[in-house]
Amino acid sequence: MQEVKCLTLKDLLGVRTLVNKTGSDDAASMNDHKENICMDRRKMTPLKSESLTAALNGHGKISSPEITHITPIKLTEKAHPDPWTPTANLKMLINAASPDIRDREMKKTLFKPIENKGKIAEEEEEEELDDSCQYEALDESERRPSRKQKSLGLLCQKFLALYPDYPESSESINISLDEVATCLGVERRRIYDIVNVLESLMLVSRKAKNMYVWHGRSRLPQTLQGLLQAGRDQHYDLLMDQREGNGLHAVQHVQNAHAASSRRKDKSLRIMSQKFVMLFLVSKTQTVTLDMAAKILIEEGQEESYDSKYKTKVRRLYDIANVLTSLNLIKKIHMREEKTRKPVFKWIGPGNFQSSSNSDDLRGQISNSGTERREKMARHSSFQVITAPPVNQRLISSAPSTPHRYSTDEPVDYSRKSGNNSAVCRLQFGDGVHPSVSPAVPSALASLAMPLQADLMPVPASFSHPLAILPQTPLLMLYSGNISDGASSLRKRERSEEDDHQTTKCRRRSASIESDTVESESLSSSTRRSPVCSPEGSPWDEASFGGLHEDDVAASSSKDALLSPHYLYVPNTAGLNSFNFLLPAGHAQGGVPAVAMPYFVVQSPLIAGAMPTSSTEGAAGFSVPTVLSPAQFVMAGGAYGVTEILQSPEHHGNVPATTSSPRAEESPKPAQTQTPVTPKEASLGSKSFFETPGAFGSLVNQSAARKRGSAQRRLDIGHTAAN
């Protein structure tokens, strides 16, 4: 039997001592037994695969049974910080093999120096190209332009920057689309869209294929005015109202317009641009949405729900809107009323095409007047334009305001005297002549406005010097055309005048009388002459005039018994002081009612200090005993005879006077000479305007009154001796 040997502690200690003894003598033997040394194992921590292979190799080399039974220390596996991947392994192998490969190639190139020069240069160029391509790819991704930078609006702005807005008329600027496309760095098809819109507004015109002529904005106002008229002819305004919900009555016109548009074969971008601009011009709000414009511009042959046609139309309209925005004709706004995000465009281009057509002259005027603006405030041109009087009269007559006259700077001369026996006071009020008829009375009445004018009346030779010059102050007369009513009212006036010995109730109405309303109601800016005759030669002598006496009223009542009642509106005039006005208040049936007299007014300055002369309801007399004696006002359709002198013992006492008739002196023209008629014949014509109880010297007949216009009637102030 084979004996089994057992290891004892002595054997183990012998191995340690053996190692210590041989370690100093032989280094190779130390390397063979280093795996059994614990300190060496702690210092070296191989991987699992390495430890296994080392253990296997160690056991193969060491055949000693003592080493074979030594159990190795199991180390904990540590995860690799960067786990290997196939790509990482490939990179590691390439890096490991690259030095050897480079060394091998470098050795080959050492023996071929001439061929090596060309190859090295080519390799360097290829490396540079590869690097530049990589950098360009990175820059391209970083510097990629946005959609706004590539938009048609920005491209149009660059295109417009190449040419002036207002070129010289003698200068011809040609546009080559190929050159422009190359200059802007875009395709030519992008330039086509811009040029088509510009051609629709006549900013450019086609000369040849891909050749255009630049005109600028000089023709833009005329083009827009023509498009506005064309849009109205095609009833685009009714279409816009219908889309806004206001054009239900225009359905028939809209159908006709659609039928006309459906027959139109030209569907180019230029025509569509013109239609799009027409919608802005005819719109009341001058705002258009692309949705509305697309539905209007779609022909009747296709349904609006046809998506492809509708979307195409909207896309093309959006391109047109971008170009128009670059031209500063429209702008995109946001409507708060609209809940959708669809764009809304508003017209900001020229609106007054006639005034903007002379843009060159306007710019010249602005540049010339710019230096004088600080020195002198410029007045608007409308202040220097004199409008037509009929227009002013129509506007003023509709104004519900109380009239008052303007203050005049002209001097008033009352000191002139005439040497003739029949002295005449000529009241010259102005030079304007604008006769017309004032409306606003009932049908039974005739309201005549008498412009007091001096231009149409001949000036007698004996009256070369006017005695008074007053501002434009017309008189307004209302009279009734009913003869019987006039006679009845005169009878009432007779009865009221018989009680003239009592104190007259004086009405004082102070009102601010506006000059514009006076002109509209009485046709202002006209003048009138009124002679006042005095046998003593001094028409303004207080002794030559008398007050309105009740006896004279009774004496003259028989002459004007059939005359119709009259009403006088007398404004505040400084030259009419101390004149008596009889204003009848009682009326017969069918006469002038009180409400029909808006100017039944005597202003307070005229009647200041007046004393009441009667308290009857039939008449009210106003008298101012200041400078002049009261005289009689007689107003008729033609020349006037001189009335008798009214003596007023209340104010100045009785003054004898003679009867005079200046009719021949007043009318140098034979055609206008008036023959005296009876008061009865004059009342039949109903053309007299105003009479007081004084006697009539003469009145005008009907045929002569027709010859004389309302602008030629005169106001005569006269007096004669009492019968």
UniProtKB/Swiss-Prot annotation:
UniProt note: phenotype after gene disruption:
Embryos lacking both e2f7 and e2f8 contain multiple intersegmental arteries that completely fail to migrate from the dorsal aorta. Gross morphology of these embryos and initial formation of main axial vessels are unaltered.
> What keywords are annotated for this sequence in UniProt?
Activator, Cell cycle, DNA-binding, Nucleus, Repressor, Transcription, Transcription regulation
Instruction: Kindly list the GO molecular function terms attached to this UniProt entry.
Output: DNA binding; DNA-binding transcription factor activity; DNA-binding transcription factor activity, RNA polymerase II-specific; DNA-binding transcription repressor activity; RNA polymerase II cis-regulatory region sequence-specific DNA binding
Where along the chain is composition biased (Basic and acidic residues)? 494-503
The reply to whether Signal figures as a keyword in the UniProt entry is no
Keyword Membrane among record annotations: no
An example Gene Ontology CC term for this record? RNA polymerase II transcription regulator complex
- Biased composition of type Polar residues is found at 356-370, 395-405
One Pfam annotation reads E2F_TDP
**Which GO terms fall under biological process for this protein?**
chorionic trophoblast cell differentiation; DNA damage response, signal transduction by p53 class mediator; hepatocyte differentiation; lymphangiogenesis; motor neuron axon guidance; negative regulation of cytokinesis; negative regulation of DNA-templated transcription; negative regulation of G1/S transition of mitotic cell cycle
The lineage's top-level taxon is Eukaryota
Q: Where is the composition biased (Acidic residues)?
A: 122-139
InterPro entries per record: E2F, E2F_WHTH_DNA-bd_dom, WH-like_DNA-bd_sf, WH_DNA-bd_sf
Location of the protein in the cell:
Nucleus
Q: Which residues bind DNA?
A: 147-216, 264-349
Chief location category: nucleus
Q: Where is this region: Disordered?
A: 121-146, 356-379, 395-417, 489-546, 650-689, 702-723
Where are stretches of biased composition, namely Low complexity?
520-535
Job description of the protein: Atypical E2F transcription factor that participates in various processes such as angiogenesis and polyploidization of specialized cells. Mainly acts as a transcription repressor that binds DNA independently of DP proteins and specifically recognizes the E2 recognition site 5'-TTTC[CG]CGC-3'. Directly represses transcription of classical E2F transcription factors such as e2f1. Acts as a regulator of S-phase by recognizing and binding the E2-related site 5'-TTCCCGCC-3' and mediating repression of G1/S-regulated genes.
Q: What is known of its domains?
A: In contrast to classical members of the E2F transcription factor, atypical members contain 2 DNA-binding domains and regulate transcription in a DP-independent manner. Both DNA-binding domains are required for DNA-binding and are proposed to form an intramolecular structure that is similar to the winged helix structure of the E2F-DP heterodimer.
> What family does this chain come from, according to its entry?
Belongs to the E2F/DP family.
Please describe the quaternary structure of this protein: Homodimer and heterodimer: mainly forms homodimers and, to a lesser extent, heterodimers with e2f8.
Its recorded name reads: Transcription factor E2F7
Q: What is the organism field in this record? A: Danio rerio (Zebrafish)
